Amino acid sequence: MAADNAGRWPGQPPGPPAPTHPASSVSLRWRVMLLAMSMVVISVVLMAVAVFAVTSRALYDDIDNQLRSRAQMLIESRSLDIDPGKAIEGTAYSDMNAMFYIPGRSKYTANQQGQTLPVGQPEQDVMDGTLLLSLRTVEHQRVLAIRLASGNTLLLSKSLAPTGKVLKRLGTVLLIVGGLGVAVAAIAGGMVASAGLRPVGRLTQAAERVARTDDLRPIPVIGNDELARLTETFNMMLRALAESRERQARLVTDAGHELRTPLTSLRTNVELLMESMKPGAPRIPEEDMAELRTDVIAQIEEMSTLVGDLVDLTRDDAGNAVHETVEITEVIDRSLERVRRRRNDIQFDVAVTPWQVYGDAAGLGRAVLNLLDNAAKWSPPGGRVGVGLTQIDALHAELVVSDRGPGIPPQERALVFERFFRSTSARSMPGSGLGLAIVKQVVLKHGGTLRIEDTVPGGTPPGTAMHVVLPGRPSPAGSDEAER
């Protein structure tokens, strides 16, 4: 992701979002509960396996220790040398099977009821002297064979059946306890999921309420955790949506109000023309007819300008603009050509530095044209308008459009960028009251700033200087200041 953002322009919006994957059909509550159950099941299984393994190993080690201890006792007591038959018979009382083998002479054996001490090849090897010791499990018995220093062999075995029963009972207990643990985990997971996701449920209900009823009331914020911040973010979205709808309603209302005046005047003039064309109606003098035609054309142009401005505003609001690298100097040149055709009596003093901005070329062109049109409109006949573009730091350049008109009072400077605002002195001038609103909207969307100052502070008249700061970079064509 860092590599994707490294080459991004100042103010450039992020690229298209990554493709999303189909959402799971399992609800978030079930996923949380299943996750908790899975963790508990894994923990219970690991614990049960560990307990069973440790217990099993301990029980088998205990049997081995019993066999070794019994053999050691028989050897150290020398009872096998004194009376081997009695010693082997006594071993049977300790739940063990025993055999004492004296090569070439005799074999003493004592077994538990229903059991036989198994003698296999390992035990035979000990009896033959090939091995000194053998310890193994065979026929559900643990068998120990030891070669004594006298050449005799002692064999002991103990049944594993009691140990198997203990381990079986232990497995049953672990299974029951584990099952209860999973059940408790499922119940606890469901309760935790219900309690933890209750704010998400409120958000879902609020979103459904907005979609169903257009009710944009904020949701109460409880706590200060992540879900509370999510609720605050959702409330911010609701406020932004409410403000957007309010702006749309205000735009429609203001547009209807602004269109009413030229439409009424146009309708009156058209009706007057139609009445004059009826048979027997008095003819309008040619001078008045020419004035009437001029008024109709002016009213149509006024409505066309207003509709065009409204289209520009709604286009920017919709966010459908195509962003690309824009040469601001070229935008200024094209705008100057259009303004000069309308006001060829105005002298434009241009000094610009090559500068590029990543953004909407059409929107930037409209903003620059509106600034130049506004300056030309308020300039006296034969006046001069200054147009300057200078780099103020590595990432920003400032466009200044100044005139020598009457200026804007300080108390109105914050209002001139509002839609349809027209000061008392401006109401007698042509215009829709949307030009500077478009400028503000375009500049802010490109991450810029704007302010109003006097061209000649304290002068009579003071004039107006519009300062627009735009992020971007120097044009590769060069950074020397160009004079036009």
Curated annotation (Swiss-Prot):
Topology of this chain in the membrane: Multi-pass membrane protein
Principal location: membrane
InterPro entries for the chain: 2C_sensor_his_kinase, HAMP_dom, HATPase_C_sf, His_kinase_dom, HisK_dim/P_dom, HisK_dim/P_sf, Sig_transdc_His_kin-like_C
Residues in Histidine kinase domain copies: 254-474
Transmembrane segments: 32-52, 173-193
GO molecular function: ATP binding; phosphoprotein phosphatase activity; phosphorelay sensor kinase activity
Cellular component annotations (GO), alphabetically ordered: plasma membrane
Enzyme Commission number, as recorded: 2.7.13.3, 3.1.3.-
Listed Pro residues bias regions: 11-20
Residues carrying Phosphohistidine: 257
Keyword set, alphabetical order: ATP-binding, Cell membrane, Hydrolase, Kinase, Magnesium, Manganese, Membrane, Nucleotide-binding, Phosphoprotein, Protein phosphatase, Stress response, Transferase, Transmembrane, Transmembrane helix, Two-component regulatory system, Virulence
Domain HAMP intervals: 194-246
Entry-linked SUPFAM superfamilies: ATPase domain of HSP90 chaperone/DNA topoisomerase II/histidine kinase, HAMP domain-like, Homodimeric domain of signal transducing histidine kinase
Topology Cytoplasmic: residue spans: 1-31, 194-484
Topology, Extracellular side: 53-172
Summary of the function given for this chain in its UniProt record: Member of the two-component regulatory system MprB/MprA which contributes to maintaining a balance among several systems involved in stress resistance and is required for establishment and maintenance of persistent infection in the host. In response to environmental signals MprB acts both as a membrane-associated protein kinase that undergoes autophosphorylation and subsequently transfers the phosphate to MprA, and a protein phosphatase that dephosphorylates phospho-MprA.
Protein name (database record): Signal transduction histidine-protein kinase/phosphatase MprB
High-level lineage: Bacteria, Bacillati, Actinomycetota, Actinomycetes, Mycobacteriales
Gene field: mprB
